[in-house]
A protein has these predicted regions:
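Active-site microenvironment for binding and transforming phosphate-containing groups
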Residues: 1-213
């Protein structure tokens, strides 16, 4: 388990990042695979989710996961829908006590958000497709609908580095078409391709809300 210096100082919430280790899954899913949408054995996934629940000190029935689709959809869990079973979204928000919300990532960017004044938390799965289509903006906007007085604390978790994120011209053009200034997130290489800095692109989205992190 890994923790953020920014969030660990708050005693009324818990957070952490898990690595891929410490679970029961085998082969390509080795070992802490929590993806219910994967082709791993369901019993292994459920065992892994139980391990996670125990580690963070929450009942396994109160651990909410998403079926992530690289969308810009945000779901708020409240007293009216907290019995929901299958959540198709790429961000979760809640202010309900004693539940945990979670995000699964490999290369994509995990974002954890805490709104201190109203005790609202959120987690975001920001891949390139979700990011370019507004998953970050949608999450903050939806959080701000709960209350206008906001004090955000944001942590951007581990993700793919730009030196390992090689993309083609078509990918590059999608971002330039969206905004010419997006070219600063790309570095050309010798293969007529580009390296994309997903983390910095997501960071820019966050700072547009005047949030320092």
């Amino acid at each position: 388990m890994y923790f953020s210096k920014e969030l660990i100082k708050f005693t009324n919430i818990k957070h952490c990042f898990f690595s891929k280790n410490g679970g029961v899954s085998k082969n390509v899913y080795n070992s802490l695979n929590c993806g219910l949408g994967s082709k791993d054995k369901k019993e292994n996934i459920l065992n892994n989710l139980s391990i996670v629940s125990k580690k963070i000190g929450v009942d396994k029935n109160n651990l909410y996961t998403m079926i992530q689709t690289h969308s810009n959809k945000v779901v708020t869990i409240n007293k009216n829908n907290q019995n929901i079973k299958r959540i198709y979204s790429d961000a979760l928000i809640t202010n309900i006590r004693n539940i945990a919300i979670s995000v699964l990532t490999a290369d994509c960017v995990p974002i954890l958000i805490y709104e201190k004044i109203n005790n609202v938390i959120a987690c975001v799965h920001a891949g390139w497709r979700g990011a370019i289509n507004g998953i970050v903006e949608n999450t903050f906007n939806q959080m701000m609908q709960i209350n206008k007085n906001n004090s955000f604390y944001v942590v951007v978790g581990p993700c793919i580095s730009s030196k390992n994120y090689e993309v083609g011209k078509e990918f590059y053009n999608q971002f330039i078409y969206k905004n010419k200034k997006n070219e600063k997130f790309f570095t050309s290489n010798k293969n007529n391709k580009f390296y994309f800095n997903l983390r910095e692109y997501v960071n820019l989205k966050i700072t547009k809300f005047d949030i320092k992190f």
